[in-house]
UniProtKB/Swiss-Prot annotation:
GO terms for cellular component: cytosol. It comes from Streptococcus agalactiae serotype V (strain ATCC BAA-611 / 2603 V/R). GO terms for biological process: glycine biosynthetic process from serine; tetrahydrofolate interconversion. The keyword Zinc does not apply. Its cofactor is pyridoxal 5'-phosphate. The gene is glyA. It is found in: Cytoplasm. One of its GO terms (molecular function) is pyridoxal phosphate binding. This is Serine hydroxymethyltransferase. Catalyzes the reversible interconversion of serine and glycine with tetrahydrofolate (THF) serving as the one-carbon carrier. This reaction serves as the major source of one-carbon groups required for the biosynthesis of purines, thymidylate, methionine, and other important biomolecules. Also exhibits THF-independent aldolase activity toward beta-hydroxyamino acids, producing glycine and aldehydes, via a retro-aldol mechanism. Homodimer.
């Protein structure tokens, strides 16, 4: 019987090896992808539990299946912890991803074809904020706002002007590659001025909001969406928050049965664990350290005239760098750094001139290295090594030196003890 196959390694050597190789890769790499992090063993244990066996369409106490008493407890814990952590009245923990959380919010607030104002992808927005290749751009009429060409920061007066000209039904605030504080109060004022809903996608900064190191959107947004990984350091999944009961009911209907069937209760359990971790006082220190590390790294790039630091700095967990003075494009920079076991992603920069498959920039984030215990000193050194590798990308001797020093760093800060 299949139930006898309890030795994973013996039963499926190929798959076991692939997972083992990935564990080794993560251990030996400096992870600087801003949307990635390192979850606790408790989060992994919850996600790998028997809850994966249980189907539970509906919501706690209102299920379409029997035998749901235990999963009701699990999901209720996740809901209450999310509400407490973010000081919100209502929470839906069922979205399978941030994109599905955004889709549910759109479904709850607007109709297909309605005008929506969202951040331009090259300026730091997300695919689901109106990109033509996304369901969002195909289903709704998105108009984009960008950043100021000089400061490379949000220009709220210009956003108001665009809103007045286009009269959107919904304004989306939030980003996937914007390094500065977002003023949600100003966004709400703009939304109110044109009688629009305000939705905030805080997927990237949720952990910083939770730890008190970025202003919360909850008092201002009609709906707030997020992922539960990234800076929140939980499993991959989505979460929707609101203080409006009528909107909460629409959100619930949009998630189920609107977009999804049965929730992934094993993932919801892992979300509950991560939310409890974020409620611990130590998480405030973690959020502070993420920002300190990002600012330390950004400063190294800022002090080198061969690189352009977008917006001249960072207030959060990430920053963007134009690398085209030292290497052809961001894609090549990504590949060179991967050679020396530093993982990040190519990224478009404001007013990008290259294709999204090449880009002028790279995006650098510090959640994962901070989770491993690295601090300001290590962050500065990593930035120095990145610059060394990029400036000497055709010199294999130099790349070997960098790779060896990266190995020393990763050995000193293991992914998981034992």
């Amino acid at each position: 019987m299949i139930f006898d196959k309890d030795n994973f390694k013996e039963f499926d050597q190929e798959l076991w090896q692939a997972i083992h190789d990935e564990e080794i890769r993560q251990q030996n790499n400096i992870e600087l992808i801003a949307s990635e992090n390192v979850v606790s063993k408790a989060v992994m244990a919850a996600q790998g539990s028997v809850l994966t066996n249980k189907y539970a369409e509906g919501y706690p106490s209102h299920r379409y299946y029997g035998g749901t008493d235990c999963v009701d407890v699990v999901e209720s814990l996740a809901i209450e912890r999310a509400k407490t952590l973010f000081n919100a009245e209502f929470a839906n923990v069922q979205p399978h991803s941030g994109s599905q959380a955004n889709a549910a919010a759109y479904m709850a607030l607007i109709e297909p074809g309605d005008t929506v104002l969202g951040m331009d992808l090259a300026a730091g927005g997300h695919l689901t904020h109106g990109a033509s290749v996304s369901f969002s751009g195909k289903t709704y009429h998105f108009v984009s706002y960008s950043v100021d060409p000089k400061t490379e920061m949000l220009d709220y007066d210009n956003i108001l002007k665009i809103a007045q000209e286009t009269q959107p039904k919904l304004i989306v605030a939030g980003a996937s590659a914007y390094s500065r504080i977002i003023d949600f109060e100003k966004f709400r004022q703009i939304a109110d001025a044109v009688d629009a809903y305000l939705m905030v996608d805080m997927a990237h900064i949720a952990g910083l909001v939770a730890s008190g190191h970025h202003p919360s959107p909850i008092p201002y947004a009609h709906v707030t969406t997020t992922t539960t990984h990234k800076t929140l350091r939980g499993p991959r999944g989505g979460l929707i928050l609101t203080n409006d009961e009528a909107i909460a009911k629409k959100i619930n209907s949009a998630v189920f049965p609107g977009l999804q069937g049965g929730p992934l209760e094993h993932v919801i359990a892992a979300k509950a664990v991560a939310l409890k971790e974020a409620l611990d006082p130590s998480f405030k220190i973690y959020g502070e350290d993420i920002i300190k590390n990002a600012q330390a790294m950004a400063k190294v790039f800022k002090e080198d005239d061969d690189f352009h630091l977008i917006s001249d700095g960072t207030d959060n967990h990430l920053f963007l760098v134009d690398v085209t003075k030292v290497i052809e494009n961001g894609k090549k920079a990504q590949n060179v750094l991967e050679e020396v076991n530093i993982t990040l992603n190519k990224n478009s920069i404001p007013f990008e001139r290259l294709s999204p498959f090449k880009t002028s920039g790279i995006r650098i984030g510090t959640p994962a290295i901070t989770s491993r215990g690295m601090g300001v000193e290590e962050s500065r050194r990593i930035a120095e090594l990145m610059i060394k590798a990029l400036k000497n990308h055709e010199n294999q001797d130099v790349l070997t030196e960098v790779r060896q020093e990266i190995k020393s760093l990763t050995d000193a800060f293991p992914l998981y003890e034992n």
